[in-house]
Amino acid sequence: TYKHTPIILGGIEASLRRMAHYDYWENKVKHSILIDSGADLISYGMGEHSILEIAEALQSGIPVQEITYVAGTVFKSHDISRVYDPVVLPSFEQVQTDKKAYADSFAIQYRNTDPFTAKPLAESYGNRGYVIQNPPSQPLTQMEMDDVYDLPYTGRYHPMYQKEGGIPALKEIKFSLTSNRGCFGSCNFCALTFHQGRILQTRSPVSYTHLRA
């Protein structure tokens, strides 16, 4: 029934697995989640801009396979000749077997988290083609940040978790407030820069006075 429905991944899980990556649970280097899942696109990082552009493209009749130009997305292709000035990462076969190649690949990715200087990145999967990462989306303006956090979030977990007793960790963050995004640090234990980028984005002080009950 849904054979021709575009499948687009997002969120931190897909974002941090957008290229070849080490999986702690399986203790091995795995493919980009775009390869393993069979999805059409990844909207990585903070996706407010990219998901709107994807939706507008689909609404206008552009096939999902041709949506290869949106900042903040990852797509698959057998041809990188039409990608402007890409940086070719070590192939999956290389990073799977060579620790230095893995480190080199991650270092290149880390240096391309700034939307103003980042280049497209291409990772080869042999006869499966390439996984190509476009530069990150532009950061949100303060007004956009205010609008995002003024939405009517419920602060509740999905009902599917009720039979398991809920999500205990939610108690720690349920009443926390998001004041900013991004981090210019490079802490090796933290994925914040890799997910949200280096550019700090902040809410206005007045936005906190409009908090919903």
Which residues does each predicted region cover?
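Iron-sulfur (Fe-S) cluster-binding segments and ferredoxin-like electron-carrier domains
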Residues: 190-203
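Glycine-rich, aromatic-lined ligand/substrate-binding cores of catalytic
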Residues: 139-144, 148-152, 167-170
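Short, glycine-/Ser/Thr-/acidic-enriched flexible segments
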Residues: 14, 48-49, 153-155, 182-185, ...
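N-terminal pre-triad scaffold of radical SAM enzymes
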Residues: 164-191
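Glycine-rich beta-alpha loop elements in corrinoid/cobalamin-binding modules
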Residues: 1-126, 133-134
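Conserved small/polar residues in nucleotide/adenosyl-binding loops
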Residues: 209-213
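Catalytic cores of nucleotide-enabled group-transfer and carboxylate-activating enzymes in metabolic
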Residues: 26-31, 35, 43-44, 135, ...
